[in-house]
A protein has these predicted regions:
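Bacterial Sec-dependent N-terminal signal peptides
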Residues: 1-37
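Membrane-proximal, proline-rich intrinsically disordered regions
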Residues: 28-78, 134, 306, 315-319
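Aromatic-residue-lined binding/catalytic grooves and analogous aromatic/hydrophobic interfacial grooves
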Residues: 29, 210, 227, 232-260
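Hydrophobic-face positions in mid-chain alpha helices that act as interaction patches
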Residues: 54, 84-86, 93-96, 206, ...
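Inward-facing hydrophobic residues that define packing positions of alpha-helical scaffold repeats
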Residues: 56, 121-124, 202, 209, ...
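Alpha-helix C-terminal capping/termination sites
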Residues: 64, 157, 161-164, 239
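Conserved, well-structured interaction surfaces
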Residues: 93-162, 196, 214-219
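Short coil/linker segments at helix-helix boundaries
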Residues: 161-199, 203
């Protein structure tokens, strides 16, 4: 299985590269609006292999941000679930609106999640358009594979949260989300982009993942590798109810990735390092302030707000 969970890694230091001209249609009321000292201009960043690699690391960091896999995507999935599964005790009105299925256009959580995802997509587009500066053939393939994996991952979440539902066996011409495959650097003009169909978005996601699989190595430290991309592709096919492809690709991962499930389920969580069943895990630290899973699920001694989200007894009794 593909696991997107946070890691409380005590000594992990990851680089968040902010490129001043790559902010896309979003600002965050919960963050200070400052120019980071580490920021560099786009032309400098894309002029060397090291710069391209740093943009890629920044794309990972943004994907693991609290707006996305650092907590909010998981929180939305819970809050949008059947009310019989959980309670929302929190005081954040915007999250309460999501739980009530009454989301208005200026919901800052929704805005920031969408904006953060497109920031990652824009960064991956920058990388893919400037791969020529990477001269080492193996590095070039790997970087292309990782960029397309991250782009596919973010589009898959965007279309599921912001597009209409995929309907198996139909044309799926219902509206999905805008597909943007070229770098945006000028944010002063009209940035509106028409929405693509759900079918078009899924087609792009599958294309990116197949190309990612072809380029990624089978092992790649804690970054995405070929089996990460295969596992995500299996999940995409499962969402499409293409069970044959989902099964075949999942079996490939199970049989060949070298990964295995933990003997004790609870040992898969609250670990200080990646574990045997992690095909891909976001490297999110509790110290970085980006771990919204801790904020809204954990008790106060663990750094949370006391449990804004809790499960119902009826749901717990199912286990």
């Amino acid at each position: 299985m593909l696991i997107f969970k946070t890691k409380q890694m005590k000594n992990l230091k990851y680089l968040i590269l902010t490129i001043s001209s790559l902010f896309l249609l979003t600002s965050c009321d919960r963050d200070l609006d400052i120019n980071p000292e580490q920021g560099i201009d786009t032309e400098t960043a894309i002029s060397t292999p090291e710069g391209i690699q740093q943009i890629l690391i920044g794309a990972y960091a943004n994907t693991g941000d609290g707006d996305l896999f650092g907590g909010d995507l998981q929180i939305y999935a819970d809050l949008l679930a059947d009310d019989s599964y959980l309670y929302w005790w929190g005081t954040y009105a915007e999250l309460g609106n999501i739980h009530e299925k009454n989301i208005i256009s200026d919901n800052v959580y929704v805005r920031d999640t969408r904006g953060r995802a497109y920031k990652v997509i824009n960064a991956t587009n920058v990388i893919l358009e400037n791969l020529s500066v990477v001269k080492d053939a193996d590095d070039k393939k790997r970087i292309e594979g990782e960029a397309k994996f991250l782009r596919a991952l973010n589009y898959f979440e965007l279309v599921r949260f912001f597009g209409k539902q995929y309907e198996a066996g139909k044309n799926n011409t219902q509206l999905g989300v805008p597909i943007v495959l070229k770098t945006v650097t000028d944010f002063n003009g009209d940035l509106s982009v028409a929405r693509n169909t759900v079918e078009e978005v899924y087609t792009q996601v599958i294309k990116d993942l197949n190309e990612s699989i072809a380029n990624l190595p089978e092992e790649n430290s804690f970054y995405a590798d070929a089996y990460s991309a295969k596992a995500l592709l299996s999940r995409v096919y499962l969402q499409k109810q293409d069970y044959t492809n989902a099964r075949n690709i999942a079996n490939d991962v199970i049989e060949n990735s070298g990964k295995s499930l933990m003997t004790n389920y609870k040992d898969a969580f609250n670990t200080s390092e990646n574990i045997s069943e992690d095909l891909f895990a976001m490297q999110v630290t509790s110290q970085s302030g980006e771990n919204d899973l801790i904020t809204f699920y954990a008790d106060e001694p663990q750094g949370g707000r006391g449990g804004d989200i809790s499960l119902t007894e009826d749901y717990l009794n199912l286990f």
